[in-house]
């Protein structure tokens, strides 16, 4: 594959010189398109952690789940719910013939792309919240795009954190990372309690409406990438940016070897976990967590979460719905997967500070999720065509060595 890419680059260099000699313009992104990859940078946004708001929010979530009959799509993506609890990973895309800019959460835990309508109603849920909070990261006005198609279908999605969005299904041109895909289906949301739009890139089987080609599938079908696969590099907790590469992998961003683990679900990006080493204790954790870029914290069943918390001396607080912990957790927590794959994470990644108090970044939930506090220390390649997720220990570097998948 490398030799093919090198040959292609040489041909393109020759072509570029030929075009310049004739006074013609060189097409934008000619090199990127030749390598069949789309590199999309994250913008990292941080908000102070608020334990009181977390507790009130999750208690409200539990009440809503008891009252509502509609099944949730997934556990709420904390960054896209009403309370951001850590770094939020979003990317800028454009929608429409006039390239209306949107900044959307990149979410491996859901599968739908939806954006906020220019006339949307933002559902205010707590005192002091701006009535336009959902429009601050860009909006979409269908009538201003000559390529917009209203499909006349209703869209509704609800997350387990109680947040929800409703609107109408459209097709239009979507631009991301220098690539442009035409007739992409997505939702134009007119009512939402979520902070901003979401770019869901999971399996199509997890979509909120009858199966359609979501963004990664369309990228492949329109020949922009070779396969429905992408690699995720969130970068360090203090970094201002990260990258997702559709159709490619950055071999400079990990140490050791990438090992492919079978995806254990037909509609969610889950892999087999076996044990967790923490503070000299080995905790049995035979479960299949979702590797979810749209969730800040890590979640396990109460049995597993209690054992992890006990190992670091953290105590459950029912009001905050979190474990209170020391602000100075030392050492590492090591996640042991199938095939001998291990990912080591400093326990400092699992400390949430609110004033002088600190909380453990693992909490209880019926859904098992490895969120951003895990993913920042892993380099992950999601191969949805091959039904695998490959993992390796991350390497923080500005160097890059991208190859196609």
UniProtKB/Swiss-Prot annotation:
EC no.? 3.4.23.24
Supply the alphabetized keyword list. Answer: Aspartyl protease, Cleavage on pair of basic residues, Disulfide bond, Hydrolase, Protease, Secreted, Signal, Virulence, Zymogen
Q: Which segment of the chain is annotated as a signal peptide?
A: 1-23
The chain positions of domain Peptidase A1 read 89-392
Task: Give me the stretches of Low complexity compositional bias.
Answer: 58-70
Q: Which reaction does it catalyse?
A: Preferential cleavage at the carboxyl of hydrophobic amino acids, but fails to cleave 15-Leu-|-Tyr-16, 16-Tyr-|-Leu-17 and 24-Phe-|-Phe-25 of insulin B chain. Activates trypsinogen, and degrades keratin
pH dependence, per the record? Optimum pH is 2.5 using casein-resorufin as substrate, and 6.0-7.0, the pH of the saliva, for cleavage of Hst 5.
Query: Active site located where?
Result: 107, 292
Which residues hold pepstatin A?
107-109, 160-161, 292-296
Question: SUPFAM superfamilies from the entry?
Answer: Acid proteases
According to the UniProt record, where is the region Disordered? 52-78
Concerning what turns on (or off) its expression, the entry says: Expressed in greater amounts in the mature biofilms compared to early biofilms during inflammatory disorder of the palatal mucosa among denture wearers.
Q: Provide the residue ranges of the propeptide in this protein.
A: 24-75
What Pfam families does the annotation carry?
Asp
| MF terms (GO), sorted A to Z | aspartic-type endopeptidase activity
Any stretches that span the bilayer, and where are they?
A: none
A single Gene Ontology CC term: extracellular vesicle
InterPro entries (alphabetical) = Aspartic_peptidase_A1, Aspartic_peptidase_AS, PEPTIDASE_A1, Peptidase_aspartic_dom_sf, SAP-like
The record's section on CDD domains has: SAP_like
Functional description taken from the UniProt entry: Secreted aspartic peptidases (SAPs) are a group of ten acidic hydrolases considered as key virulence factors. These enzymes supply the fungus with nutrient amino acids as well as are able to degrade the selected host's proteins involved in the immune defense. Moreover, acts toward human hemoglobin though limited proteolysis to generate a variety of antimicrobial hemocidins, enabling to compete with the other microorganisms of the same physiological niche using the microbicidal peptides generated from the host protein.
Subunit: Monomer.
PANTHER family associated with the record: ASPARTIC-TYPE ENDOPEPTIDASE, BETA-SITE APP-CLEAVING ENZYME, ISOFORM A-RELATED
What is stated as this protein's family in its record?
Belongs to the peptidase A1 family.
What is this protein called in UniProt?
Answer: Secreted aspartic protease 8
